[in-house]
From Swiss-Prot:
It comes from Eremothecium gossypii (strain ATCC 10895 / CBS 109.51 / FGSC 9923 / NRRL Y-1056). This is Elongation factor 2. GTP binds at residues 26-33, 158-161, 213-215. GO terms for molecular function: GTP binding; GTPase activity; ribosome binding; translation elongation factor activity. Pfam families: EFG_C, EFG_III, EFG_IV, GTP_EFTU, GTP_EFTU_D2.
Amino acid sequence: MVAFTVDQIRSLMDKVTNVRNMSVIAHVDHGKSTLTDSLVQRAGIISAAKAGEARFTDTRKDEQERGITIKSTAISLFSEMSEEDVKDIKQKTEGNSFLINLIDSPGHVDFSSEVTAALRVTDGALVVVDTVEGVCVQTETVLRQALGERIKPVVVINKVDRALLELQVSKEDLYQSFSRTVESVNVIISTYADEVLGDVQVYPQKGTVAFGSGLHGWAFTIRQFANRYSKKFGVDREKMMERLWGDSYFNPKTKKWTNKDRDADGKPLERAFNMFVLDPIFRLFAAIMNFKKDEIPVLLEKLEIALKSDERDLEGKALLKVVMRKFLPAADALLEMIIMHLPSPVTAQNYRAEQLYEGPSDDPACIAIKNCDPKADLMLYVSKMVPTSDKGRFYAFGRVFSGTVKSGQKVRIQGPSFTVGKKEDLFIKAIQRAVLMMGRFVEPIDDCPAGNIVGLVGIDQFLLKTGTLTTFESAHNMKVMKFSVSPVVQVAVEVKNANDLPKLVEGLKRLSKSDPCVLTYMSESGEHIVAGTGELHLEICLQDLENDHAGIPLKISPPVVAYRETVEGESSQVALSKSPNKHNRIYLKAQPIDEEVSLAIEGGKINPRDDFKARARVMADEYGWDVTDARKIWCFGPDGNGPNLVVDQTKAVQYLNEIKDSVVSAFQWATKEGPIFGEQMRSVRINLLDVTLHADAIHRGAGQIMPTMRRATYAGFLLAEPKIQEPVFLVEIQCPEQAVGGIYSVLNRKRGQVVSEEQRPGTPLFTVKAYLPVNESFGFTGELRQATGGQAFPQMVFDHWATLGTDPLDPTTKAGEIVVEARKRHGLKENVPGWQEYYDKL
């Protein structure tokens, strides 16, 4: 069954130039797992007949039932190239066998955190786009994530069989549709690409775009056709590739190439791509689907396709599958494209190192990553945890960036909040053993050198979700992943039977380990809260919790949305607060932060860990901050990295530095639970104006300063026109024209705003984009299907926080209702306390 042995793979791991780490990314239902199948089958794991139906990488039962991928799965493939193909590879290679580590990731928006984890450990991405639907919202999101991680894309345009069989398009229409899709992918690439990568746009004539059908198991690149024809006509292959795309035409009478679409007599000429590439495919489809028994053998002979005796009796789609698979096997086209155009770890780590590593780019760890050096000390990034077959244990799944990881080796396990020189979040433990991930199976190996993807056993109890393993004494962490979605939907979970409580607590711990983007915590009123990125994500998480992680029946509250508290103006007067012993005073004002700056902080462009001078320069140049203010940012909050700031604007205050720590921790506390209804603050800037402190150190300890700073922050906040913000989804809905009306009526009921509506050229489909408050999104999918007779498919991504215009302190308004309800739920007094509660008179 398996066509290659673990030893073969292991020996290839040492030739890092011949390794490719790649992930398959796409919009939901564009056929990632199906395409992955044809690759896996080439490596000899699925039997050929099953490919296209097995979806080997969908390992979970719910994935197979729903027909979607939820968790990303890794698999290693082995491939050999012919000598002449190897010569065309633009980077260093040894020999002609290649090892491809492939990660199939989910396309559904709610799981984009899984995609981020997959992208971190790979260097190249195969972007799958549906011919009929084209580039969708999720294609763009994932592609943007990939380019942000400096990952090189190649594209495959999938489901071409749909265009031929369902839409019955003409050759020229198909060419136009292809070229539109390629163009829209390139627009996204040029918008988000990093200069370091150089030109990573995709070009069919260079072989970085493949066309095919995952379901039928066939695909081709222009390079393959150029190969066939260059032998036949005796032309140079490079020249042939240029001619098979774009505006080049072949005149069969004069046997000349031209770039005009008419010949000398004014008769139309056929485009070379249509004539040489699409024509044989169209003819095969026509002959087989119209059951023309006499034409088929002639065509097959011309195309040198030999059928076995039992295959000759097939007809219709079954025959089509067999023939197309022999004519243009998908695996050949895709593997060739992956090997030729995606970078090896040696090439990629050279330009990815600075972006992966938190420390300076000249320290030994970073240099070892740059050189992908298997003999240096170990640097390994764990991007996620994968549950093992025995309950409660996890494999740490990650990639070796430098050094070699061995079974039984002692390593430093550094969690995300580790800083160099401190002991916090650091364990020194031995790795029990290393394994090779193979979709549904694992194979033990002794060691694994730099540039490869590996699973580790025995360190799951020291890492929460991600972290760095190293043997350097002074290594910084690998950078933490930025998720493009945030957990905004939460539910409270209770046990039905009080004796099961310890199991629930244990289960919640396991759940937060197994999913990179789920949050679990205990609220003040003692409820256990689980937060996810959307309805589907939460549903899957809770199902996992009930069935696997905790294994007990649960009571689940209706879903609740996370809000944020913010301010719209500057404080109308200076907020003053005295310490409990009346010897210290803090004076401050609150004011809003521009949305741009908040987004830059949330997206990691402005980073609390950056050098303060460099950060001040960026904030002054790009966001128009005053340089002295930007240099005096004391901290970000909550959690040390949120979009709220404390700026020190005091003049000549004695002992100021001694209270800095207390002020910072009080600010973290205040921004985590705002005064309106205990939600996090967002986009609030606190300016410290003056501080009077007692001369005696004992009278200005943390116990005096922290409550004071918190009260002052609340007072300043409530004096500055407080507002609340709700999370908003961007919804993209695809549907036929007659269903558009139904969509509008549902969106209007749900406070939705339509942003754009456009028809995809060449198809009857409309794409409607709209903003929909997360609060209204529950059951939206169901209502939409009802209103449109099941013809509309929504995709929702968290897009932004929108400020509610009404006053949250007035219980008669929309915002006020939300506040009162939330305060009841949290068990607080119904009325929001006024600023007077937190303000002290002189």
